[in-house]
């Protein structure tokens, strides 16, 4: 995807939903994005992508983690050069919003379906 090509590969902010190709995701504005980044600061990665890459098991683990926590981190131990494409694939399959990629860690958010279960937005 073209929007993943950035000069600063250390940090990446996902586009807003006006440019997004995933129509069922919620729109996150810059203030909400900053709030999610602050909330994710103390969170440890719950999913680690290793030598096997993004498998169905990884997708299922990300989906279950998003249901339980809404906001998660994914760490890339392998495939560091392809982290943007892999994160894009995970976001598409799990219907999640990419908050930011910092280094080899991606922060993903998916709002809970029930309003009483929502923790962040």
Predicted region positions:
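Positively charged, polar, low-complexity stretches
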Residues: 2-9, 17-121
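Structured mid-domain segments that build the active-site/substrate or prosthetic-cofactor binding neighborhood
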Residues: 12
């Amino acid at each position: 995807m073209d929007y993943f090509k950035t000069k600063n590969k250390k940090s990446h902010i996902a586009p807003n939903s006006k440019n997004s190709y995933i129509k069922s995701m919620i729109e996150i504005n810059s203030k909400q994005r900053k709030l999610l980044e602050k909330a994710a600061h103390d969170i440890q990665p719950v999913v680690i992508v290793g030598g096997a890459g993004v498998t169905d098991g990884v997708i299922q683990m990300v989906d279950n983690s998003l249901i339980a926590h809404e906001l998660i981190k994914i760490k890339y131990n392998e495939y560091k050069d392809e982290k943007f494409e892999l994160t894009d694939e995970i976001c598409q399959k799990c219907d999640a919003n990419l908050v930011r990629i910092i280094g080899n860690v991606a922060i993903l958010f998916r709002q809970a379906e029930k309003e009483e279960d929502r923790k962040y937005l």
